[in-house]
Curated annotation (Swiss-Prot):
Chemical reaction(s) catalysed: (6R)-5,10-methylene-5,6,7,8-tetrahydrofolate + glycine + H2O = (6S)-5,6,7,8-tetrahydrofolate + L-serine
Assigned EC number: 2.1.2.1
Protein name per the record: Serine hydroxymethyltransferase
Cellular compartments per GO CC: cytosol
EC main group: transferase
Swiss-Prot/TrEMBL site (Plays an important role in substrate specificity) positions: 224
Main location group: cytoplasm
Biological source species: Limosilactobacillus fermentum (strain NBRC 3956 / LMG 18251) (Lactobacillus fermentum)
Length: 411
């Protein structure tokens, strides 16, 4: 598209990024490809409008149509997850989490969340994050034997530290999470239960993972990842009464004017998520991840953490390859496969290096990849990592990647 007075360097960079996305197999589990309708809504004239407040209660005039847009997003979100309350204004998942902490806690209170090397997120209590600076935070780990959540150990830890808030949910955990067991743990120690379902929200919406909304006090999520919406955040609850505190924590507590053009993109994405085709899509995401796990499990050098996956992602232990996660990520980048380095349970390397990779199937599934394609991608990863110094083989992998991306263009 041509624009008068455009910044040529900017648009050249955007064009190169478009080419990169077209020519790359995208396996970062938190990335996806939005529809043209979502992109159009986000690029609409709503970006011009300031709208501090909430529908029907704004601090600016001229918000009558903005109110309609935001209310649609709220209504679609509530229907999608069976929630009594939804706030679609958080700019990100991190800001959604921050707002919940502000609503439920006071500085110095104690949070028990998933440890980073167990698959948790920065905002679940990392000492370099606001969550670890404003609150006393502790991380629960995985069972050394199964590499899955050990609910008895989490209960024992909760009894010991007596947290005011327990955070369930992960950014790199491949198995089903038992929300009811977390509810029992929280009730036993008198804590609030917050679920961060950012990664699995699309699976929850379609029944491929149990729904935490009826169980938890508060649920947060991003709106991209498996929901295929714009980058943003959202807060859900079964309690309208608690929703009043949450609204105040978002605005004016942690944010000013909402990004209504992004909220329009959220509304469009949620509308798409309510259609039958979205359930088919998520089903294929899960099948593709399982197909990749099957291939990786046959490798002599790559180990799948937990032995498999029940959702959209896998964590790969690269110890036997002799490569760090950082090295493997760079190597795969060179053959046009995009992944991210990831800590494995009890990883001794720093988060900037790691001993593993995280791979996910949302983006390739949006491009129409099926199980056989996913298996081929896994085989190409193994081939590349097992032959890291062989430029001839790496060139073969890159050529095969090119063929796959040509066969499955970004719509």
């Amino acid at each position: 598209m041509e624009y008068a007075g455009k910044d040529a360097q900017l648009w050249a960079a955007i064009g190169r990024e478009e080419q990169r996305q077209e020519g790359t197999i995208e396996l970062i589990a938190s990335e996806n490809i939005v529809s043209k309708e979502v992109a159009a809504a986000q690029g609409s004239v709503l970006t011009n409008k300031y709208a501090e407040g909430y529908p029907g209660k704004r601090y600016y005039g001229g918000c009558q149509f903005i109110d309609q847009v935001e209310q649609l997003a709220i209504d679609h979100a509530k229907e999608l997850f069976g929630a009594a309350y939804a706030n679609v204004q958080p700019h990100s998942g991190s800001q959604a989490n921050m707002a919940v902490y502000q609503a439920l806690l006071k500085p110095g209170d104690t949070i028990l969340g998933m440890g980073m090397d167990a698959g948790g997120h920065l905002t679940h209590g990392s000492k370099v994050n606001f969550s670890g600076k404003l609150y006393h935070t502790y991380g629960y780990e995985l069972s050394p034997e199964t590499e899955e959540l050990d609910y008895d150990a989490i209960l024992a830890q909760a009894k010991e530290i007596q947290p005011q808030l327990i955070v369930a949910g992960a950014s790199a955990y491949s198995q089903i999470i038992d929300w009811d067991k977390f509810r029992q743990i929280a009730d036993e120690v008198g804590a609030y239960l917050m679920v961060d379902m950012a990664h699995i929200a699309g699976l929850v919406a379609t029944g491929y993972h149990p729904n935490p909304v009826p169980v938890a006090d508060v649920v947060t999520t991003t709106t991209h990842k498996t929901l295929r919406g714009p980058r943003g955040g959202m807060i859900l609850s079964k309690s309208e009464e608690l929703g009043k505190k949450l609204n105040s924590a978002v605005f004016p507590g942690t944010q000013g004017g909402p990004l209504e053009h992004v909220i329009a993109g959220k509304a469009q994405a949620f509308y798409e998520d309510l259609q039958p085709a979205f359930k088919d899509y998520i089903g294929q995401v899960v099948k593709n991840a399982a197909a990749m796990a099957e291939v990786f499990n046959e490798s002599e050098t790559i180990r799948v953490v937990t032995g498999g996956t029940a959702n959209h992602l896998l964590v790969l232990d690269l110890t036997k390859t002799g490569l760090t996660g950082k090295d493997a990520q760079a190597l795969l980048d060179s053959v046009m496969i995009t992944t991210n380095k990831e800590a494995i349970p009890n990883d001794q390397r720093s988060p900037f290096v790691t001993s593993g990779l995280r791979v996910g199937t949302p983006a390739i599934t949006s491009r129409g990849f099926k199980e056989d394609d996913a298996k081929q991608v896994a085989s190409l990863i193994i081939k590349a990592l097992d032959n890291a110094d062989d430029q001839t083989i790496l060139a073969e992998v890159k050529e095969a990647v090119h063929a796959l991306t040509q066969a499955h263009p970004v719509d």
